Amino acid sequence: MNFIDVAKIYEKIEATTGRLEMIDYLKNLFLSTPPEILDKIVYLTLGNIAASFEGIELGVGEKLFLRALSLATGIPQERLEEEYPKLGDIGKLAEWAVSKKAAQSFFTEDLTVERVFDTLSKVARATGEGAQDLKVRLIAGILSDAKPLEARYIARIVTEKLRLGVRDMTVLDALSEAFLKGRAYRDKLERKYNIYPDIGKIAKVVAEKGIKGLDEITITLGIPVRPMLAQRLRSAEEIMEKIGPRIFAEFKYDGERMQIHVWKDGKVKIFSRRLEDITEPYPDVREYVSKAVEGHEVVLDCETVAINPDTGEILPFQELMHRRRKYGVEEAMKTYPTVTYAFDLLYLDGRELLDEQLDDRRKILKEILKENEKARLVQYEEIDGNVEELERFFEHAVEMGTEGLVVKDPKSIYQAGVRGWSWIKLKRSYISKMIEPVDLVVVGAFWGKGKRAGTYGALLMAAYSPEEDVFKTVCKMGSGFTDEELARMPKLLEDYKIDHKHPSVISNIEADVYFVPVKVAQVLGDEITLSPTHTCGWNKVRKNAGLAIRFPRFMGWRDDKGPQDATTEEEIIEMYKEQLKVVEVEETKSEEEA
């Protein structure tokens, strides 16, 4: 398959502002692709060469790419560096340079998808002495045979700036349309993706075998399962009404969510909430968890916390992040020792447990987990309908240095990749009006004026709707930034910049600049109000109105979270409703006092 055919589809996707149109282009691309290379097409379309959890990066900066482009086209690197700011996009620069060279070239070989993919794989795996020169030669080799449009997308993929805005869920929609009779099996496809998030492999399976191929996809050691997530409510009483009377109430530790895979021979892999392989920084966790489940093959869902080595107290999450380093691991282990609390069991000795009730998963976990000083079962209470008992346990959890509780339905199954009402967070800050920050995605920006001239004055922020796989605006945020953060912001967001509103963004507000929804920020506001302009919760609380966060303030970037981990539209709606209840109670008290 020639890469030019793929590049033409990419050009159409890049130009569209409609999500359904994007899905249709992808469907046609997938149907025209030989099944044996569909995985490669999918990876390239997502700007990767492998599943994201494999952590394979091309490692090509702009300077290195310009060397390769100069070698391929004969245009001096200095000239390319002069033209780059004028065009403002590495892809457009490569397209321009190759078009200049094409006018003088008569002998080129058609580029195939296989050649592009295999070359980029070699680039990613080039390490050691001479690796940079090898990468330059490899990239120059495919650019030499590239047509101008092909060069545009090769440049963007290589420098990790593809910006098509296609995400895994968009690919699943297109695969469903192409190979699974439209929407009929879309839910099953997503369930399989949630337990085996290698979307290239899944694409190849459904293209070759259709719906029957999905039955072959199971939990596999070394492949992370997308974690189940919790909703939130403000009070013990509401939680009991929602999932009671019988509940499990677990400590919610201020640590890092870890999915730990253990083989019978003691091999261990650790994945973060975002499915990143974080095995290397945690040799202590590997050792004490493997001992605790010795003789078994397991996939555990856990929370790991940093401990004060002198007092044994739980340290804040930010302290644990000092463990995320490539160097000085031994020293970090001594300064920030850890304890891991296991709270769920997804797989045991070849058997998937996702469809077992939490009751049964917990019993099995207690049977196989040989607790030690560092690997422990989560602290929890089984409570049967007693709200006061739940409130007392909540206060106890807070006194013990935790964030609060996660309350769970003992009859619930493990819904991988789903934020459902079977798990509900009860945290200290939910007891008050919007003291709890939310995590929102940057989808646009507005140029600053006066002191902020030359940088962004405010960001357009959005919540995520997993049901629709779109981002809906909830505020314009211009407060809370330091001068240094403001100065750095255009460069920080440059890689995500696009020239039109992204198809997965629902917005009534026109921004000066638009972004692919990737970057997540923590935001704190005064309250949530009805809005005639913002689209979050549109028509769901009141007709012709959405919801907005009033006086939003920037609290920091959440680099540990992806866009799909952001606060959801439903959570914003629930926070608004709970806020109304608090206001009503306060007004009633005031009237009684009067």
From Swiss-Prot:
It is an enzyme of class 6 (ligase). ATP binds at residues 250, 257, 273, 303, 343, 419, 425. One of its GO terms (biological process) is DNA biosynthetic process. It holds the Pfam family DNA_ligase_A_M. Gene3D superfamilies: DNA ligase, ATP-dependent, N-terminal domain, DNA ligase/mRNA capping enzyme, Nucleic acid-binding proteins. It catalyses: ATP + (deoxyribonucleotide)n-3'-hydroxyl + 5'-phospho-(deoxyribonucleotide)m = (deoxyribonucleotide)n+m + AMP + diphosphate. GO terms for molecular function: ATP binding; DNA binding; DNA ligase (ATP) activity; metal ion binding. Signal peptide: none annotated. Its EC number is 6.5.1.1. InterPro entries: ATP-dep_DNA_ligase, DNA_ligae_ATP-dep_bac/arc, DNA_ligase_ATP-dep, DNA_ligase_ATP-dep_C, DNA_ligase_ATP-dep_cent, DNA_ligase_ATP-dep_CS, DNA_ligase_ATP-dep_N, DNA_ligase_N_sf. The active site is at 252 (n6-amp-lysine intermediate). This is DNA ligase 2. It comes from Korarchaeum cryptofilum (strain OPF8). DNA ligase that seals nicks in double-stranded DNA during DNA replication, DNA recombination and DNA repair. It comes from the Archaea. Its cofactor is Mg(2+). Belongs to the ATP-dependent DNA ligase family. Transmembrane segments: none annotated. The keyword Phosphoprotein does not apply. The keyword Thylakoid does not apply. Keywords: ATP-binding, Cell cycle, Cell division, DNA damage, DNA recombination, DNA repair, DNA replication, Ligase, Magnesium, Metal-binding, Nucleotide-binding.
